[in-house]
């Protein structure tokens, strides 16, 4: 019987567990190549620390938070984890307080930063100077090559299946277009909620995945209103909608009274000012206030099998086990 060694895993006998081996696990010194996606208003230091305890990389969101609140979240993660542990902060370049948040990130010596919603290139030098790894989110092949050449430590390739602000190309098409030209760790994102998605991404050549929506149902995601969690549990694959596609600022979330009204206005030719006024404050209203009809609950497309709230550790264990089964089955195909 011929034994086929899977290079993604190595066996640690003393712990009786599988240790994953990808470019991303090496870069971030984590057990599993899973990054928890940053989510505005709700990704704090408690969730990020829980992700690290589970062997993954948690990310503190800066969207919706002041610079002082971001600092508090970073210090919460430090207090829980201690020094030398892996967590990150998301830097939203369109945010009005981006300079203040970036200064906090540098002052606190955050291990890594995910960068989105703007041109990441000018930020590499000051962040690298502070000893911080830079992982920009990219929506196309051209930008992926540019950020690699400019010194990005890794990239997150995010398909239109992702919740929140997203692009116009599916994840699989992006991976097909980008993977052949990228040597740094590539993280797949958008619509991945289980081990099947992780396995598919790794088989295609990604070094890891970013998952946001799955961790909305984590017990440690304590800032998300219970009503919003229940709305996600109740949702299925046809409940995912994109608002703002015609404006160039697409946002994906759960269909409800707000999204129906917005889409009616958008595709009736309403001016941008009307659409902006209509959507203002809806993210917070849905996520924090729990208004599931007049707020917008941001979530990705893969919703059908998100049916229960679990601790982060349990979620990760389920994902890891399913990934390993899928990869084992894939090895039998040829």
Regions found by a protein language model. Name each.
Residues 95, 160-161, 191-192, 214-215:
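Acidic, glycine-rich active-site loops and adjacent beta-strand->loop/helix elements
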Residues 16-185:
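Active-site entrance/lid segments in N-terminal catalytic domains of soluble metabolic enzymes
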Residues 1-17:
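Short, Lys/Arg-enriched N-terminal segments with co-localized hydrophobic residues
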């Amino acid at each position: 019987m011929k034994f086929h060694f899977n290079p993604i895993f190595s066996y640690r006998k003393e712990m009786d567990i599988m240790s994953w081996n990808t470019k991303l696990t090496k870069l971030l010194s984590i057990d599993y190549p899973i990054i928890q996606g940053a989510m505005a208003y709700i990704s704090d230091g408690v969730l990020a620390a829980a992700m690290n305890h589970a062997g993954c990389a948690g990310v503190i969101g800066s969207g919706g938070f002041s610079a002082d609140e971001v600092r508090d979240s970073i210090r919460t993660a430090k207090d829980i984890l201690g020094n030398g542990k892996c967590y990150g902060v998301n830097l939203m370049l369109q945010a009005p307080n981006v300079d203040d948040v970036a200064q906090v990130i540098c002052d606190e010596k955050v291990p890594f930063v995910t960068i989105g919603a703007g041109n990441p290139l000018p930020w590499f030098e000051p962040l690298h100077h502070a000893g911080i790894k830079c992982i920009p989110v990219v929506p196309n092949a051209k930008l992926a090559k540019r950020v690699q050449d400019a010194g990005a430590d890794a990239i997150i390739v995010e398909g239109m299946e992702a919740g929140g602000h997203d692009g116009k190309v599916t994840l699989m098409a992006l991976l097909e277009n980008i993977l052949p030209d990228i040597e740094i760790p590539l993280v797949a994102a958008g619509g991945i909620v289980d081990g099947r998605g992780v396995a598919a991404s790794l088989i295609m050549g990604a070094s890891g995945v970013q998952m946001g929506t799955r961790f909305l149902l984590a017990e440690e995601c304590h800032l998300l209103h219970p009503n919003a969690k229940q709305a996600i549990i109740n949702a299925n694959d046809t409940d995912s909608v994109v608002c703002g596609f015609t404006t160039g600022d697409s946002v994906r979330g759960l269909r409800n009274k707000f999204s129906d009204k917005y889409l009616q206005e958008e595709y009736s030719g309403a001016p941008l000012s009307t659409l902006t006024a209509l959507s203002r404050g809806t993210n917070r209203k849905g996520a924090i206030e729990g208004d599931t009809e007049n707020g917008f609950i941001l979530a990705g497309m893969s919703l059908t099998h998100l049916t229960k709230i679990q601790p982060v550790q349990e979620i990760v264990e389920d994902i890891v086990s399913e990934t390993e089964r899928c990869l084992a089955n894939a090895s039998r195909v040829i």
